Amino acid sequence: MDMDNELKIGKIILDVKAYEFSYEGYGVFRINKFPILIENLLKNEIADIKIESINSKYALARVINRKTNSPERRNIIDIETYRAGNTPLEIMNYVSQINFKKMILTDLFKREIGWTKNINFIPSINEFSYRNKITLQWVIENNDIKIGFFEKKTHKIVSFKKCVLINGKFNEFVRLFIQNLNNNRKEWLVYKNIFSVTFKYSEKYNEFLIIFNTTNSKNISLNLISKFQKNDLKIGIFQNIFNLDKVRLIKTIKIFGSDYLTYKIGKYKFFVGPNSFFQINEEQMLKIYNKIKVLLMIKGNESLFDVYSGISTIGIYLAHNLKEVISIEINKESVEFAKFSAKLNNVSNIKFIQKDATKYFTNLNSDSYVNNDNILVFDPPRNGLNKNVLYALKNIKVNKIIYLSCNPRTLVRDLKELIGLKYKVKFVEGYDMFPQTYHIETLVLLER
């Protein structure tokens, strides 16, 4: 291979060997230290590749002729979902996926915080059919509605046929929705404000929510909506109205049917609204919550602060073993459904605070609840803890922290800060909450 030739879009490079497999699921090859990330190429596989795009940090390429296959490779079951970038690890057998994620987590913790102990990594019971929620894109083009996933790194629709990440009944429901849409296409074409549709599903209770995500308040016809109703299903249909950049949710309108879904974690039931956060892999969630219960060794005199609590699944799940729970969540809908769920489960020792976690912790120093017996549970979004939350921890007396993270990189960043506050990492465990993807859920216990 001539390494000195100019790298450009469309260039074909022969006999490339992937010497690494990146965290994001690309085979990695370098020319003069410049990385080329190759889709659908595992470590040690050899292929002819074509450069698709280039920026200042790396190039992206695709395989045009794979010449060797890794023993870790398996056939793609669902090519549409893979093309959309939703299952980047589907090319790898499941045992190898677990080993890969464990290696990523182990290397990151060793490099960033000096953790040298073994990190156990818990596989999912189901490597497919585990999701209880999906969102499909909605595009009107040439007087036609296209609905499906965006092809990876494009705005080209991959039409929905099935998704291996949801189960058969959920797939059937989505296909029936699309069939109804096709049968009434002319009426739906007037709704140019719809940009995506979110589906939520409770398998145990056979309940569905459909949420139309829109950019203005043009009301969707109840006559059209009612055609989605089936006698054997409990369905709720909503319209979310966003600002024009599709980022900020302005308003939610209930159009038809049920207000919520019902889920069960262990012996506890939870009500979940159209915009309430709920983990998408329920079986893994139960494993994590049981592990938290074991790790905390609760005596009964503790107060637990459930921070970024969502509908307070963790707080409610542990409440009967605690003196009290303080649930802190900014989202109004989530707080309302958390209150409903607490009442449903006869949990009375829980206090709900609808407030941004940063603002709450800024004014926490004089709070009478904070003492050595109490526990903090953090389950933040992907960007991790706000610096002001970490700063506030300097002045409060909490000996135990549970940190549940969906982003290992922001997790280790925050752990460095907590270690600086004299906390010690006592336990680390990884969970495969998202099989076929590179995402990793990590549970950490800290003490001081």
Task: Locate the predicted segments by residue.
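Short, acidic/hydrophobic/Gly-rich beta-strand patch recurrent on exposed beta strands
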Residues: 27-32, 148-152, 338
